[in-house]
C-alpha cells in the first residue's frame, strides 16, 4: 500500500466559527493554528495546505493569565535608528482588538509561502457579528 499524499485541488475545506469570549489567548491560538494547518484531518500532508477556514468572533474579549494583561509587550520597528515601538496587551486590545490573536497564530504557523496562504484563511472579528454567514460555518467549541 502506498503512502497517501493529499493533492491541493482535492482538499475539502470547511468553515468553522470559534467564540473567543473569556478564552485564554494561547489556547485559542494553538487550536486555530492546528486547524489552519489541517492537522486534525487524516489526510494531513505537511507540504499541502489541507486546513479549514476559521472565523473567530469576540476577539476583544480574549483573556490572558497572570499579569500578562499589563506586562506582555508587542514590539515593532520602523526601520530607522531608534524607531522601536512597544504596546502592552491591554493597549493592543483597545486599539486593535484581535491583532494579538492574529500575531499569536501567525507565530505558530510555518514561515514561507505555505504559512502565508494558511494565515489568509483566518478571519478575526472583535464583536459577535461576522460577514461569513453565507458559508454556513459550523460552531467549534473549545475546551
Curated annotation (Swiss-Prot):
PANTHER family the UniProt entry points to: LARGE RIBOSOMAL SUBUNIT PROTEIN UL13M (PTHR11545:SF2), RIBOSOMAL PROTEIN L13 (PTHR11545)
Protein name, UniProt field: Large ribosomal subunit protein uL13
Protein function: This protein is one of the early assembly proteins of the 50S ribosomal subunit, although it is not seen to bind rRNA by itself. It is important during the early stages of 50S assembly.
Family: Belongs to the universal ribosomal protein uL13 family.
Assembly notes: Part of the 50S ribosomal subunit.
Superkingdom of the organism of origin: Bacteria
One Pfam family in the UniProt entry: Ribosomal_L13
Gene3D superfamilies named among the record's database cross-references: Ribosomal protein L13
Annotated GO biological process: negative regulation of translation; translation
Organism placement in taxonomy: Bacteria, Pseudomonadati, Pseudomonadota, Betaproteobacteria, Neisseriales
Encoding gene, per UniProt annotation: rplM
InterPro entries reported for this sequence: Ribosomal_uL13, Ribosomal_uL13_bac-type, Ribosomal_uL13_sf
GO cellular component term, pick one: cytosolic large ribosomal subunit
One term of GO molecular function: structural constituent of ribosome
Keywords tagged on the record: Ribonucleoprotein, Ribosomal protein
NCBIfam families, per database record: rplM_bact
Amino acid at each position: 500500500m502506498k503512502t497517501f499524499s493529499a493533492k491541493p485541488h482535492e482538499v475539502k475545506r470547511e468553515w468553522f466559527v470559534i467564540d473567543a469570549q473569556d478564552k485564554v489567548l494561547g489556547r485559542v491560538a494553538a487550536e486555530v493554528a492546528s486547524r489552519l494547518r489541517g492537522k486534525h484531518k487524516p489526510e494531513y500532508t505537511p507540504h499541502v495546505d489541507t486546513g479549514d477556514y476559521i472565523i473567530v468572533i469576540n476577539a476583544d474579549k480574549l483573556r490572558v493569565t497572570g499579569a500578562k494583561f499589563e506586562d506582555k509587550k508587542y514590539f515593532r520597528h520602523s526601520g530607522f535608528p531608534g524607531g522601536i515601538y512597544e504596546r502592552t496587551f491591554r493597549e493592543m486590545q483597545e486599539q486593535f482588538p484581535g491583532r494579538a490573536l492574529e500575531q499569536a497564530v501567525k507565530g505558530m504557523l510555518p514561515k514561507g509561502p505555505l504559512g502565508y496562504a494558511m494565515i489568509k484563511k483566518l478571519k478575526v472579528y472583535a464583536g459577535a457579528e461576522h460577514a461569513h454567514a453565507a458559508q454556513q460555518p459550523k460552531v467549534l467549541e473549545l475546551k
